[in-house]
Amino acid sequence: MADSSPEVKAVARYIRMSPFKVRRVLDQIRGRTYADALILLEFMPYAACEPVRKVLRSAVANAEHNNGLDPRDLVISQAYADQGPVLKRFRPRAQGRAYPIRKRTCHITIAVRPIEEAEAATAS
């Protein structure tokens, strides 16, 4: 059951951002073409767009360099953010107490594959 179209991915690990905030951006670009996703990431007002844009460009560069694929024919097949390690800090409070602060990290994974001919006909 091997798929004939190669799937190329890129991973950014230990990004100092909550995976919940990154998933909000990834949900918007999943299933879109590379050009559409870049335009969306350029104009969305979220800080998570910058690391996602870097991972997307890396995945497309991997596809272009390693597999010889054309960036115009690529679609985002997978995009997800897994939780990374949590940095634990403490905030001093009144009367000798301390409240925990959890600085979350995430691992961003984006996979691209060539668009199918049937999908290309419906997209045009």
Swiss-Prot record:
Q: Which Pfam families match?
A: Ribosomal_L22
Report what the protein is called: Large ribosomal subunit protein uL22
This protein's gene is called rplV
One GO biological process this protein is involved in is:
translation
Q: Which UniProt keywords apply?
A: Ribonucleoprotein, Ribosomal protein, RNA-binding, rRNA-binding
- This protein's superkingdom? Bacteria
Q: Which organism is it from?
A: Synechococcus sp. (strain JA-2-3B'a(2-13)) (Cyanobacteria bacterium Yellowstone B-Prime)
Q: Describe its partners and assembly state.
A: Part of the 50S ribosomal subunit.
Give the similarity note: Belongs to the universal ribosomal protein uL22 family.
